[in-house]
Amino acid sequence: KSGGNAVEAAIAIGACLSVTYPHCTGLGGDGFMLVADAHGKVSTISGIGQAPRRLPAFDASVNVIPHRGPVSMLTTAGNVDAMGKAFELSRRELGGRQSWASLLTPAVALARDGFPWTASGHFWLDFRAGEMNRLPGVASVFLANGKAPAVGEIVRQPHLAHTLETLAERGHRDFYEGHLASRL
């Protein structure tokens, strides 16, 4: 509707899904894109993260990597970088005209103003409630009173809205090198 191209739409959709389907995708995950131009040239964007710089190469006290939680993360989140690289490709080679901030604005609104919780989100949070209740960040947003939001209940994520606003204002690299990186 605003004259953007398919890559710009994919970035905006990905940002919105990070708000509305956090059980399937998110800013803290990996991201991948295959982009074909009008002449059939295909570009690949890989947002597969590397191991964090501060992760010890080997810790003899760790016998098993936990299934969930901060210690289970073995790579740096690559999704935001993939979105940023896709934006740059769109501008450089595909005539992209949308601003980075405009692509994140719908996701900011969803996170700030809320959206109806989905059946899929309810199923997975309910199914994993025991595990998720042990993660204070997840529990504070998605498990009020220890229970998953009901299907259709309005869910707001003000901290995620702030993160998305910061990305919109400062650019995708802030997630890795700026204010957001220092908070992570």
Please state what every model-predicted region is.
Residues 1-2, 6-170, 175-177, 181-183:
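Noncatalytic scaffold domains of N-terminal-nucleophile
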